[in-house]
Amino acid sequence: MTNIRKTHPLFKIINDSLIDLPAPSSISSWWNFGSLLGICLIIQILTGLFLAMHYTSDTTTAFQSVTHICRDVNYGWILRYLHANGASMFFICLFLHVGRGLYYGSYTYKETWNMGIVLLFAVMATAFMGYVLPWGQMSFWGATVITNLLSAIPYIGTDLVEWIWGGFSVDKATLTRFFAFHFLLPFIISALVMVHLLFLHETGSNNPTGIPSDMDMIPFHPYYTIKDMLGALAMILILLTLVLFSPDLLGDPDNYIPANPLNTPPHIKPEWYFLFAYAILRSIPNKLGGVLALVLSILILALMPLLHTSKQRSMMFRPLSQCMFWLLVADLLTLTWIGGQPVEHPYIIIGQLASILYFLLILVLMPLVSIAENHFLKW
């Protein structure tokens, strides 16, 4: 009798995706982050579901309901901090996952890559709306500042902002709809993940060499299931350490002050994972220019397949491209630091230089260096 997992219509899909899936024998730990992101998504949906059972999306009670969760609900505090810090882990894994794709040339799988960019935008939108829900000072003013950016769109901007707000300022209607969308989006993300994996399994995984590995494949189970379990264990350990020892390390103390439309915090800034984009936004004195740069800082990823000028897929054997890549990483860390600093000298000029370098590296320097490497190898 044939094994049920290979014949049953539903089990067959799971089997072909997680058990008998042929995987390259050489993929390193950088390939763990896909499964870690899946685990993050599950953690976020589960903790979020239980938080939603006690949360009220009304401006008068939202802040109080979060306090109630932390003080009165059994293990409410751990749910709340798992959810908040789980978002940080989600973004750490996301950035490493995207970085891996850039380094090893995984973007040549165009459908998978573009689906990944859509997922990145969806996760960023979800995280932004989630940050508004506790209705603290930074929640309120973050929502006001970021939604206000849409007013830079010519002609329809102001109407668009008021339409999103559901009034003339961030108020009850805004909070209610943000809660609705924050609840809905993770399920849409789950569906998009399925599509992302569908596209990936059409081509199979890339590997560190960037060379086709069709002749050297091994089954996903047990080799990569056990490897992914190790990664998951490490990530959960880091997450629990964060939650149990310093849950507010990555948060903003201003968010423990209830939202007050009459009092602006001295420094409005988003969560740490948006700071690099926020720094790019602030480094351009023009409002529309800043918004365009903000969107392009992420959307530029879609151009990666077009900007690939090397004859080799991966950066594994390209030392000069590796230098450019790590310069880009250093630049993004600099932007993240600048995004959290006040708008004053010398941070302004550092932010502007880092923003210019970011686009210069991706659009000009990396493609040019790749062409030079082809030339050195007489290709």
UniProtKB/Swiss-Prot annotation:
Mind telling me which SUPFAM superfamilies this protein's record contains?
a domain/subunit of cytochrome bc1 complex (Ubiquinol-cytochrome c reductase), Transmembrane di-heme cytochromes
| Signal sequence range | none
Q: Which InterPro entries match?
A: Cyt_b/b6_C (IPR005798), Cyt_b/b6_C_sf (IPR036150), Cyt_b/b6_N (IPR005797), Cytb/b6-like_sf (IPR027387), Cytochrome_b (IPR030689), Cytochrome_b_C_euk/bac (IPR048260), Cytochrome_b_N_euk/bac (IPR048259), Di-haem_cyt_TM (IPR016174)
Q: How is the cofactor bound?
A: Binds 2 heme b groups non-covalently.
Gene3D superfamilies, sorted: Cytochrome Bc1 Complex, Chain C
Question: Which cofactor is recorded for it?
Answer: heme b
The entry marks the following residues as binding heme b b566, namely H97, H196
Q: What Pfam families does the database record attribute to this sequence?
A: Cytochrom_B_C (PF00032), Cytochrome_B (PF00033)
Q: Which domain of life is it from?
A: Eukaryota
Q: How does it sit in the membrane?
A: Multi-pass membrane protein
What positions does the entry give for a ubiquinone binding?
A: H201
Q: Which residues bind heme b b562?
A: H83, H182
Just give the chief location class.
mitochondrion
Q: Which UniProt keywords apply?
A: Electron transport, Heme, Iron, Membrane, Metal-binding, Mitochondrion, Mitochondrion inner membrane, Respiratory chain, Transmembrane, Transmembrane helix, Transport, Ubiquinone
- Tell me the compartments it is located in: Mitochondrion inner membrane
User: What family does the Swiss-Prot or TrEMBL record give for this protein?
Assistant: Belongs to the cytochrome b family.
Q: State the PANTHER family in the record.
A: CYTOCHROME B
Kindly state the subunit structure of this protein: The cytochrome bc1 complex contains 11 subunits: 3 respiratory subunits (MT-CYB, CYC1 and UQCRFS1), 2 core proteins (UQCRC1 and UQCRC2) and 6 low-molecular weight proteins (UQCRH/QCR6, UQCRB/QCR7, UQCRQ/QCR8, UQCR10/QCR9, UQCR11/QCR10 and a cleavage product of UQCRFS1). This cytochrome bc1 complex then forms a dimer.
Chain's role: Component of the ubiquinol-cytochrome c reductase complex (complex III or cytochrome b-c1 complex) that is part of the mitochondrial respiratory chain. The b-c1 complex mediates electron transfer from ubiquinol to cytochrome c. Contributes to the generation of a proton gradient across the mitochondrial membrane that is then used for ATP synthesis.
The entry's other comment says: Heme 1 (or BL or b562) is low-potential and absorbs at about 562 nm, and heme 2 (or BH or b566) is high-potential and absorbs at about 566 nm.
Please state what the protein is called. Answer: Cytochrome b
Provenance organism: Nyctimene vizcaccia (Umboi tube-nosed fruit bat)
